[in-house]
Amino acid sequence: MIEADRLIAATGPRDREEVQDRAIRPLSLADYIGQPTVREQMELFIQAARGRSESLDHTLIFGPPGLGKTTLANIIAQEMGVSIKSTSGPVLERPGDLAALLTNLEPHDVLFIDEIHRLSPIVEEVLYPAMEDFQLDIMIGEGPAARSIKLDLPPFTLVGATTRAGMLTNPLRDRFGIVQRLEFYSTADLATIVSRSAGILGLPLDPEGAFEIARRARGTPRIANRLLRRVRDFAEVRAKGHITKAVADLALNLLDVDEHGFDHQDRRLLLTMIEKFDGGPVGVDSLAAAISEERHTIEDVLEPYLIQQGYIMRTPRGRVVTRHAYLHFGLNIPSRLGEMPVVDEFLDAVDD
């Protein structure tokens, strides 16, 4: 499966959707909906940094895909009144790639590195003195004649974003003064986001229609906005352009997104665990082979929402479906589930 082909995939949008997303993306903390703790803390840190005429401390933002890490990075630059230069970990293959970005920064600018956990070790080593001392160590020459020179850099703010904070090395993680975790959004916050996006796009949308889209958006703004665009297509062709609860329900059912926000891939994963592995426990590699998927797709794309909603739990012996999965498909709950631990007990346990 190509992740971007899923309507409810939270991975990066396609080129045309990226243009539309930029149009509806909030540009200030005042317009930033949800994540109240993150918003309040960042407002405080930014106000303090501006009051001292300093650059904001280096900031790490992590959480599942589609929750607004890039949006928050752009808001930080906007609120600080500085420019932002964006790149991603896989793009920075050589130290020279990073050096070119750093030497072109103006004082207090923001350097945003998406997927920062994918930085190569050699590039990461160059980043350490840049973050800590605002200096760049560069090797000149080769062999015995090689020597290191130090270049002073203007004070800047590094904003790193990652979906896998656990893959960051300790030296890199320790150099971030501010660490923010983005959580899945509530349905109410998503409904507000959908209504705001519809207003910007000029779409007639009832509050009930916004709520119907929001509750199937898997707690993710990117998915909510993507569903809104597809429901708009349906409404323009079959409902005179007006999005009501009934229209949204018909459109999303046609798109195979059920009332819990599951698509065929989610249902396939759950049914495979129930039918082929007796509900688990099953190792992630065995599960990946059974549904012909990559391990990282299960861990980064499919699992997070299913775990957060209590349909799957991780135990020391592997993945296990909960009674909610059986109820979702109208199946009889095995008697052994009555003896299983509560869903939250093993969510953070290490898989074998």
From Swiss-Prot:
EC number: 3.6.4.-
Ranges for region Large ATPase domain (RuvB-L): 4-185
Region (Small ATPAse domain (RuvB-S)): 186-256
A Pfam family recorded for this sequence: AAA_lid_4
Amino acids binding Mg(2+): 70
Keywords linked to the UniProt accession: ATP-binding, Cytoplasm, DNA damage, DNA recombination, DNA repair, DNA-binding, Hydrolase, Nucleotide-binding
UniProt: DNA binding residues: 295, 314, 319
HAMAP family the UniProt entry points to: DNA_HJ_migration_RuvB
Domain-related comment: Has 3 domains, the large (RuvB-L) and small ATPase (RuvB-S) domains and the C-terminal head (RuvB-H) domain. The head domain binds DNA, while the ATPase domains jointly bind ATP, ADP or are empty depending on the state of the subunit in the translocation cycle. During a single DNA translocation step the structure of each domain remains the same, but their relative positions change.
Purpose of the protein: The RuvA-RuvB-RuvC complex processes Holliday junction (HJ) DNA during genetic recombination and DNA repair, while the RuvA-RuvB complex plays an important role in the rescue of blocked DNA replication forks via replication fork reversal (RFR). RuvA specifically binds to HJ cruciform DNA, conferring on it an open structure. The RuvB hexamer acts as an ATP-dependent pump, pulling dsDNA into and through the RuvAB complex. RuvB forms 2 homohexamers on either side of HJ DNA bound by 1 or 2 RuvA tetramers; 4 subunits per hexamer contact DNA at a time.
Family: Belongs to the RuvB family.
Protein name: Holliday junction branch migration complex subunit RuvB
Name of the gene: ruvB
